[in-house]
């Protein structure tokens, strides 16, 4: 298994920077017009962590976490504090936040996702105990696989019924370097160079 179901400790993530990137291929024609296309259906997130760490204990904790992941070898969960809810960052998740499917009278399994305008982002790493589901706005019983983001309802929703969910989630990432660097500035403090993370598909 190339993914460890463990989250980077929050104290090591505070002060991180980053965001989503897209890959766009642009060809400029002889006429001056452009032809643009993208091989990616989903954006990919990148982050920098560790640059604000000064405590030797925190630096040691990040080093230990890095070693346990074998550098770039194993993925892990990362809490992006700017985007980790099914609702707005300042809100509280509700079961009607995100539409995750339409019932057909037979199907009971649905995959969590979050809408960004017309773009749907698959949510593969929901937080255990945070997922709520609803059918046509009414709360329903559901089981959740927190390793895949698959929701299984106790009963199949009727045809055309709207299935929705609310949740917290982590972003699956890996280290994007096989090396981290730190310097000792006093007996009990130091400085760590920023460590890159990159979102992975799971």
Predicted region positions:
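Small/polar beta-strand repeat architecture
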Residues: 155-174
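Exposed beta-strand and adjacent loop surfaces of beta-rich binding modules
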Residues: 46, 128-132, 160
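A surface-exposed beta-strand-loop module
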Residues: 138-161
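Short, conserved charged micro-motifs
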Residues: 56-62
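Short amphipathic beta-strand starts and helix->beta connectors
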Residues: 27-36, 136-138
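Extended beta-strand solenoid/passenger and fiber regions
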Residues: 63-144, 168-202
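Polar/acidic, low-complexity leader/linker segments enriched in S/T/G and N/D
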Residues: 1-24
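Oligomerization/assembly interface segments of phage tail-like spikes and tubes
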Residues: 25, 36-55, 182-202
């Amino acid at each position: 298994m190339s993914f460890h179901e463990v989250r980077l400790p929050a104290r090591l993530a505070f002060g991180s920077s980053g965001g989503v990137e897209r890959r766009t291929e642009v060809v400029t024609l002889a006429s001056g017009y452009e032809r643009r296309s993208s091989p990616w259906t989903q954006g990919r997130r990148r982050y920098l962590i560790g640059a604000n760490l000064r405590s030797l204990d925190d630096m040691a904790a990040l080093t230990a976490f890095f070693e346990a992941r074998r550098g770039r070898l194993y993925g892990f969960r990362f809490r992006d504090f700017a985007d980790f809810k099914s609702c707005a960052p300042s809100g509280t998740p509700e079961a009607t936040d995100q539409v995750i499917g339409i019932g057909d009278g037979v199907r009971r399994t649905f995959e969590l996702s979050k809408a960004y305008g017309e773009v749907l982002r698959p949510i593969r790493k929901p937080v255990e105990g945070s997922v709520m589901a609803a059918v046509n706005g009414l709360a329903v019983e559901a089981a959740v696989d927190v390793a895949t983001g698959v929701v299984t309802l106790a009963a199949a929703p009727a045809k055309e019924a709207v299935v929705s969910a609310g949740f917290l989630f982590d972003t699956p990432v890996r280290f994007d370097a096989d090396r981290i660097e730190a310097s000792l500035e006093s007996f009990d403090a130091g400085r760590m160079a920023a460590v890159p993370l990159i979102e992975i598909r799971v």
